[in-house]
Amino acid sequence: MQVRFRLEAVLRFSSPFTPEAEQATLALIDEANRLLFMKGVPKGVDPSEVGRITGIPQFRENILDLTFESGPYTRAHDALFRFRKQIALTLGRYRLGIRDIDIGSYTVTMTGEFPSGFRVPRLPFIRHADLTNGSLTMDLIVSSADLENRIPDRLVRLVEEKIEAATYGGKGEHWELIFESGKKLRHNEGDPTRQMVERGWIKHAPARGQWIFGPQAVQLFRAFETIVMEEIIGPLSFSEMIFPKMVPWEVWMRSGHAKGVYPEIYYICTPKTRDASYWEDIADYFKVTGEVWVEEIRKRIDGPIGGMCYAQCPPFWPFVQGETLANDCLPIRVFDRSGTSHRYESGGIHGIERVDEFHRIEVLWLGTAGQTIEIADQLHESYRRVFEDILELEWRSARVTPWFMAQEGMIGSEAGCGCGGRIGTTDYEAYLPYSGSWLEFQNVSINGDKYPKGFNVKIQSGTECWSGCSGIGLERWTAAFLAQKGLDYGNWPETVARLVGEPKNLFKFL
């Protein structure tokens, strides 16, 4: 992708230019084009690709109008700020100082292959954009502060990321089979969610994508939880913590989720005030109409300040943010099972396995790259034993490369240990006889230095810190298990049947 930048700047000085100051400025422009803007540019680069001041500088009393153009080297805005520093030194002898810089116009042109249906970002920085014959021109509205914040560079990278995402294979991740268990004994051909509803084990809750789980379903949840504790958490020495379930923007900004989480989160807003009189008419409206005055409530809330728990591990990281971990405390192994997670699934809701509110045991670990990989391998072995010998599932595992990992350059990062090829996610999938499809019901992710870097976590030895996580979703375990084994506990594997006991039928509806 070829990129060009063009910037028109207005430099305002403390006093009008004298003829001597004008001559000194012109000499400085010539020197900047020959030397200053070439610093750090690799040898052999075409000069047209390097930032330079073009056209004829215009002097208007205490104002200097300049045009900067560049390719990818010493980009136009970088050239501007290099020149600002240099001219301040040069014109000081003429008692001229820069007061401010206005950006008259800024244009970015990107030329290359754009995928069919490519959509230009809609952002307040972009006044106008045009994509014609493989050339995207963006007319920007930016201030000098925006340029110092590298807004043009970030816009270019954003466009490149959108192109990469569209050409990544037409889907969010790449999939490679690792293991398949082969067929196992099945006792069910029906949809387990429908069967649980018919038997009164679960009922739809008032909110979308939400279920009320009766005693029978919870017995199975707790049995799975016991298996996890006895076969995985305990033997691998994970310690329990409680992670927050209300997540502020700061956490998602550092974790990277702020790059794309918006269509899937439940947002959290706060009241503008707790003053009861401010809300009295809202309460009165309900008392009179029996309806909640939602439109008026929208006017009286602030935020959103963040969202409800989406991915369960990011809220852990402020606990170690900015810290240096002692060598002898590593690796750290923790888990959280304290509450629900929430994702807006839109039209993707199905059964208990794809819901907006779900229950998950989140397993998280961090340490050196080698320690992180070793724990992931131990988890893989534990899951394999549980799925094969205890749950007796028909399952398979696959290595996947989520788009966000490829996008952030995490795949193949070696960290000096030759283990970068292990970064990525392994999905575990169970066969669903009633649909003839596979359900992803478990995963293990090695995230490399993504989270430690985002939250500035270091190791005493100076070794790069890595982390991993694994979400154990109770709804998905239940959906996978019942789809194959059915709801009659007499057909269940011995360990599960023993831990569940006889399902409790507490309710009788007339």
Language-model features: where?
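TRNA-recognition modules of translation machinery and tRNA-sensing kinases, especially anticodon-binding
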Residues: 2-510
